[in-house]
């Protein structure tokens, strides 16, 4: 999400809640209160996957997507119907998108190529600053840091102006192929969308599992729909500083217990404000740094929400392939769901 060079991001986990590790067992009312800064190292250590797949690992929780997991996910395909979960690249500046894509046609189709016997052609170029709250993208596991370290203990010095020498997006160039599970929190609450600032707690995720009759398992991609884009369509864009619905920090422990491989959603994943004093994105930090769990941000889950609801099927094959850019901290993404 937002750049980790910002001081509040680089030191995000320094002030996690003293009781955060036990939040899964507390009530939503107790969880919703802002937590006091303390004991962040304990939670970072408790949810850590560092060394789990070896000292040289740069794949993190994606290691949980085994060959058997991929084959099982492919067997979910019954119809061959596929649906994109990417939002069309935003071309207009808005209060929630200060950096729209810049695209320019460099050659139009008029005329012919010299010596080409009537053959013409077109070309264009585009630039996109994908991290943030607008464009659909994948955060890789060098994107956030905690106390000068990224996932698996690699130093922040591994990321320079020349790119990331460790944990970059290039490690995922073979693609993501696994089971995806839509966790439609808006439908669960019986609304078109959750209001900004609405937290999602572990008990909400548990309740959705029961309702959907799907149990989250090792190697899954979970896709959390808040209805953000439905609200934007209905009411127009709003500043991110006004809040976003999303996961409370207590959900990090829930995901770790189930060995989730990748977290995705239609917003920034973290509820904003975060309800953790002094820490703006604790879910991001725990997922990326402690668990080595990549994140799919700003997905458009409206279509897949309707298609899943129509079928009453909330699990499907997910395929996604980031751009193979050595040293990159993430990538634009077009994840596909196939029934």
Q: Each predicted region: which residue ranges?
A:
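Active-/binding-site microenvironments in catalytic and ligand-binding cores
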Residues: 6, 31-339
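A generic secondary-structure boundary signal that marks alpha-helix termini
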Residues: 21-22, 56
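N-terminal secretory signal peptides and thylakoid transit peptides that target proteins
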Residues: 2-20
